[in-house]
């Protein structure tokens, strides 16, 4: 049997992968916390930044809610919102990539997995990109990379700090090398931004993995994370099989990374806006000259 025949036979016999089920969050009026089981009135949950008041569990939120939580009301100005991905490789696995894109666009109302623009946090200007895990797992394709790169370049020209809210499964395999190229492209734009002594803050949310972790998620001047966020490159099972040893229970969590020096601060979502405003203000102030 040839290698190609072996792969063809494996496709026929391999069991379909089951997607990880989303937590049961109710029918729109009530939401059940997957951590403590508390049933909460959804309006109260949203008013608390989608954080469980009983146990502090951070529910997954979409890009629109993230912008509402972080920015001053009415201050957001979208950038490059018209960019849409194509299918340059005519990629098809169990389904055509073009079909997956159409489904994600219809279900989320987004063109791709990131929303970019400028706004203000307590009156201070900022350029920000918010990744949305609902769109193909927040995967980074050519359009995601292009939008983030353009945003950073705009911020460099306008002397603005940059905030990227990361929520991604990594590079988008359906775009092959075009997806992997975005890691270097975004990193290059960040280096030019850094050379102008401008502030860059990545906010790592659950989950941040793969090529996003291996590039712009870990290049910040200050690296922030939400509590208990999953942050890593390869999956836990792959690492355990490679090392042939059991990993700690809290491995690849925000707390584990902070203990090992990879995350500067873990900030609850309810405090993010005020803490970011303080950081922006401190960065804008000239360094004090001691007498």
Swiss-Prot record:
Task: Tell me its EC number(s), please.
Answer: 2.1.3.15
Subunit arrangement? Answer: Acetyl-CoA carboxylase is a heterohexamer composed of biotin carboxyl carrier protein (AccB), biotin carboxylase (AccC) and two subunits each of ACCase subunit alpha (AccA) and ACCase subunit beta (AccD).
Read off the InterPro entries from this record: AcCoA_carboxyl_beta, Acetyl_CoA_COase_Trfase_b_su, ClpP/crotonase-like_dom_sf, COA_CT_N, Znf-ACC
Top-down, what is the taxonomic lineage of the species of origin?
Bacteria, Bacillati, Cyanobacteriota, Cyanophyceae, Synechococcales
* One GO cellular component term noted in the UniProt record for this chain: acetyl-CoA carboxylase complex
The gene for this chain is accD
Entry keyword Lipid metabolism:
yes
Q: Which SUPFAM superfamilies match?
A: ClpP/crotonase
User: Which residues are recorded as binding Zn(2+)?
Assistant: 33, 36, 52, 55
Q: What is this protein called?
A: Acetyl-coenzyme A carboxylase carboxyl transferase subunit beta
Cofactors demanded by this protein: Zn(2+)
| Annotated source species | Synechococcus sp. (strain RCC307)
The pathway that the record names for this protein is: Lipid metabolism; malonyl-CoA biosynthesis; malonyl-CoA from acetyl-CoA: step 1/1
Checking PROSITE patterns in the record gives: COA_CT_NTER
Reactions listed under catalytic activity: N(6)-carboxybiotinyl-L-lysyl-[protein] + acetyl-CoA = N(6)-biotinyl-L-lysyl-[protein] + malonyl-CoA
